[in-house]
Regions:
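Positively charged n-region of N-terminal signal peptides that target proteins for export
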Residues: 1-4
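Sec-dependent N-terminal signal peptides
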Residues: 6-9, 300
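Hydrophobic h-region of N-terminal signal peptides that target proteins for export
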Residues: 10-18
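Active-site mouth of glycoside hydrolases
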Residues: 22-238, 246-249, 253-254
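Aromatic- and carboxylate-lined catalytic core of secreted/periplasmic carbohydrate-active enzymes
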Residues: 44, 267-271, 278-281, 294-432, ...
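Short beta-strand segments
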Residues: 174-176, 205-208, 228, 272-275, ...
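Catalytic-core region of carbohydrate-active enzymes that cleave or remodel glycosidic bonds
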Residues: 221-325
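Short strand-edge motifs at loop-to-beta-strand transitions and within beta-strands
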Residues: 439-441
Length: 486
């Protein structure tokens, strides 16, 4: 009997652990009152930390999908962006296709067949078990551009998707898919409104072409809840012959500027970089002999964007986003690209994004603003410092270990406690207590390579961090959020 009681207790604990602490336990996702962030219905903040798993539905089997999603959760990701279909029809690893009767889904569920959409259901449900939202890019933009989806078919497809997934707790809808919004806009409008007419539970956005923000075309659209931009994969000066260039020359890596350009459109909505440069992908994408983006590059993109005001960030990896494995060709590289998606999970950038999420959730969330007035004598490009702050804390990201001349009077308190956080490890080092005035700080790196990080200054009357604290808590700031008007 005693053994039975112990076994039953363990079973209850296992079930409870599996069922507890899911993000949607806080309610549905919504836009914050100040229109700049995402939150849950109960008022808790949602910091978007996305992973790019474009070909997950097509290339991974059930066991692989589970391992991948488990790895994402362990690394702190709470969103995985996928291409729901990348062909008309699309085929998955089991040889099943997405469209067995065109855009008529009446007989899509075939008895005794583990179909394409059954596998998609499995992925959505497995993600839910790990507390992850699936960012469903409904159809890739190139297919719409090629005329594979008409306005009427978009209504059918949107109705099918909405009815199938409206009651799943972990769906975020994406229109677009690497495409400008003025290409077949009537199709995107039809697809989006068809879904929104049925599904009242989930938020929606649009994934644009590189170097664009969705606000350029959809700022007034009734269906879009928040914006995304794609800062893209080019280095400074890598224009690559484009005639119509939507950004100033030599600003390709300045993804922080897209936050400002998005907020020039009204009404203001939350925004994030849904596709920055991917770790280990050739700069500019198409030349396998080019240099590749490293972990410190993807960290820079993440901190620059978020400190500029983004409501989160999406990371990507060349091998993972393609789900590369033996038997599949690479789209961005050459025959010498032998790194698999599961090897990519071990790369440093994939595992370092979680420290940004921990940092942003360690302080009162909704009062945070971008504030470059904190910084004096700032530089450009890689030497540019970027600052964000609340009422009683400020954060300054430093990519190049430059001197930081900072105005500590921008936040409350006669004295400020100051820490340095190493972006690659999340390690904290207490630097001391300082008077509230303009002070020049310099963090001395321990190595010759890039050792980027964040200077953290907090009103000494506040206890968001402890002086002897060496890592940030994954639980974040748990106190009730302050009234924005106080």
């Amino acid at each position: 009997m005693k053994k039975l009681v112990i076994l039953m207790s363990l079973l209850v604990l296992t079930i409870s652990a599996g069922a507890a602490n899911k993000p949607w336990d806080n309610g549905k996702l919504k836009v914050s009152d100040n229109q700049r962030y995402l939150q849950f219905e109960n008022g808790q903040p949602f910091f978007w930390l996305g992973e790019t798993g474009w070909l997950l539905p097509e290339r991974l089997d059930r066991a692989e999908a589970e391992w991948y999603l488990q790895s994402c959760a362990k690394a702190g990701y709470n969103v995985v962006q996928v291409q729901t279909i990348d062909g008309v029809p699309a085929y998955n690893i089991y040889g099943q296709m997405s469209n067995i009767d065109g855009w008529n889904f009446k007989n899509i569920n075939q008895k005794g067949v583990y179909g394409y959409w059954d596998h998609m259901d499995y992925i959505v449900d497995m993600a839910a078990q790990h507390g992850i939202y699936i960012g469903m890019v409904c159809i890739w933009g190139g297919l719409v551009k090629a005329g594979k989806l008409s306005v009427e078919d978009a209504k059918k497809y949107g109705t099918f998707l909405a009815n199938r997934y409206k009651n799943k707790p972990n769906i975020i809808w994406f229109m677009g898919g690497d495409i400008q919004g003025d290409i077949k806009p009537e199709v995107w409008e039809s697809l989006a409104t068809s879904i929104k007419a049925i599904d009242k539970n989930h938020i929606m956005t649009y994934h644009p072409r590189g170097r664009y923000t969705s606000a350029k075309w959809w700022s007034k659209a009734s269906w879009i809840d928040f914006h995304t931009f794609q800062s893209g994969h080019r280095r400074y000066g890598q224009r690559m012959g484009n005639k119509d260039y939507p950004i100033p020359d030599n600003t390709e890596e300045d993804n922080w500027m897209y936050v400002d350009s998005t907020w020039k459109f009204n009404p203001i909505k939350p925004v994030l970089d849904a596709e920055p440069s991917y770790e280990d992908i050739p700069m500019g994408l198409h030349d396998a002999n080019e240099l590749r983006w490293k972990d410190y590059d993807v960290r820079r993109y993440a901190y620059w964007s978020v400190f500029a005001g983004s409501c989160g960030h999406t990371y990507g990896h060349n091998a993972i986003m393609q789900m590369l494995k033996p038997g599949y060709p690479t789209s961005y590289g050459d025959a010498g690209d032998v790194k698999t998606w599961y090897q990519g999970l071990k790369d440093p950038g994939f595992n370092q994004m979680q420290y940004l999420k921990r940092l942003m959730l360690s302080f009162p969330y909704f009062e945070r603003v971008a504030d470059q007035s904190v910084i004096q004598d700032n530089g450009e490009k890689y030497n540019r410092l970027i600052a964000t702050r609340g009422n009683d804390y400020l954060l300054v990201y430093n990519y190049n270990n430059n001197n930081m001349k900072l105005d500590l009077t921008k936040i409350s308190g006669a004295k400020k406690n100051v820490w340095w956080m190493t972006a690659a490890t999340g390690q904290l080092k207490y630097l001391g207590e300082f008077d509230s005035k303009v002070i020049t700080f310099r963090y001395h790196p321990q190595t010759s390579r890039v050792e980027d990080g964040v200077l953290i200054a907090i009103d000494s009357n506040k206890d968001y961090l402890k002086k002897d604290q060496t890592v940030l808590s994954p639980d974040g700031y748990k106190a009730k959020e302050r009234d924005l008007n106080e």
